[in-house]
Amino acid sequence: MNDAALPPDVSAALANGLQAQSLDADFAAPLLRYLTLLVRWNKTYNLTAVRDPREMVTRHLLDSLAMQPYIVSGTLADLGTGPGLPGIPLAITRPQLQVTLVESNGKKARFMREALRHLALGNARVAEARAEAVDEPAAYDHLTARALDTLAGIIAVGGHLLRPGGSLLAMKGVYPHEEIAALPAGWRVGEVHPLQVPGLDGERHLVVVHKD
């Protein structure tokens, strides 16, 4: 499948979404190449439950990119990234960011390696492992997790990867009052940003948790 094989309104939906998120239109081409590869592999390997490319634009690409204003540079570990979400869209739009895509599922890890090769994306790499097994203590400025666990659960499996003073950026739906109240000692919420994802109804919040 090439980009032209995607439904004709997919490109327009992505272009409109990038504009709404104040992102450069030049990012559309690599994002569409990634989407095309994801659609193709998903038919065989079931990488995501979302099947419709139009829905993938909203629920995968634009949702991932909603956190982009809050991560500028440095090192980032994306925990339980699945097929590379949000890590690959962030690596595309933030070339100064060094992204490690942490995923234990072999099919998803193979897909991501092919995607990085296909996109010639030199600022990202795949770590095929569970987050708790990645032996890189205090190596990262940022952690992300889009659909992995509660805040305390994310910290339990991946908190060792974050340097002191670093930040965990966790995507949540409604404001997670109970999860924030259950944070372990040594971790504190810095900010909670309401997110607007073009085309997506429902609440989205980005919770930024700092490691003391």
Swiss-Prot record:
EC number: 2.1.1.170
Gene3D superfamilies named in the record: Vaccinia Virus protein VP39 (3.40.50.150)
Cited InterPro entries: rRNA_ssu_MeTfrase_G (IPR003682), SAM-dependent_MTases_sf (IPR029063)
Location(s), subcellular: Cytoplasm
MF GO annotations: rRNA (guanine-N7-)-methyltransferase activity
SUPFAM superfamilies: S-adenosyl-L-methionine-dependent methyltransferases
Chain segments annotated as coiled-coil in the UniProt record: none
Class of enzymatic activity (EC top level): transferase
Catalytic activity: guanosine(527) in 16S rRNA + S-adenosyl-L-methionine = N(7)-methylguanosine(527) in 16S rRNA + S-adenosyl-L-homocysteine
UniProt main location, coarse: cytoplasm
Chain residues that bind S-adenosyl-L-methionine: 80, 85, 131-132, 146
One Gene Ontology cellular component: cytosol
Domain of life: Bacteria
UniProt KW keywords: Cytoplasm, Methyltransferase, rRNA processing, S-adenosyl-L-methionine, Transferase
Role description: Specifically methylates the N7 position of guanine in position 527 of 16S rRNA.
Family, per entry: Belongs to the methyltransferase superfamily. RNA methyltransferase RsmG family.
Name the UniProt record assigns to this protein: Ribosomal RNA small subunit methyltransferase G
The species this protein was found in: Xanthomonas campestris pv. campestris (strain ATCC 33913 / DSM 3586 / NCPPB 528 / LMG 568 / P 25)
